[in-house]
Amino acid sequence: MNALELRDICKRYEDFTLDHVSFSVPMGSIMGLIGENGAGKSTTINLVLGLIGLDSGEIAVLGENGPAVSPKVKAQLGVVLDEAGFPDCMTARQVGKMLRLAYPNWQQKTYDGYLARFGLPPQKPLKDYSRGMKMKLGIAAALSHDAKLLILDEATSGLDPVVRDEMLDMLLEFIQDEQHAVLLSSHITSDL
């Protein structure tokens, strides 16, 4: 089964066109979207997430055709963007409590395990976290609600090589059972 299928998708802007893009991401795989800044990687991910509308083409996420996927399918997506997106006034512990309300399959024990594994202080305000720590928090959150498909948009850019390698190792662990998949956009070819 494919975790993600894009068939002939198009999105036109005044100064940019994503033109007839097709690809699939099978379960048990990591698919890389690579390109320079402005090449359409984030546009593609925003289309997959339903944040912007398609001009034409079809997208299927975990077997469900878009343009908007059901809450059940959305609950099976783990999304990590280049910014974690959690309020800086919160702590990692508070983020976990908030996400427990948002995801029916939230696994607090798994989340706490990732916080410990990554050395993330649960009571420290996120404003005091480094960029690498915030990215680790995003990965911990994405992996703690039984997501089937991880979507990472430039999630490794700006990270030091040790943190980047650690994150990439985690992605390899994530797909080992052939029941999960990853879509990773980057302009860093060594990430792929």
What are these regions (language model features)?
Residues 6-9, 16-26, 33, 57:
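Conserved beta-strand
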Residues 36-40:
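Walker A (P-loop) phosphate-binding loop of ABC-type ATPase nucleotide-binding domains
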Residues 49:
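Helix-to-loop junction immediately C-terminal to a conserved catalytic motif
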Residues 57-68, 72-73:
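Conserved ABC transporter NBD signature motif
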Residues 75, 81-138:
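ABC-family P-loop ATPase nucleotide-binding domains
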Residues 150-154, 159, 184:
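Catalytic Walker B motif of ABC-type/P-loop ATPase nucleotide-binding domains
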Residues 164-179:
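Helical segment within the ABC ATPase nucleotide-binding domain
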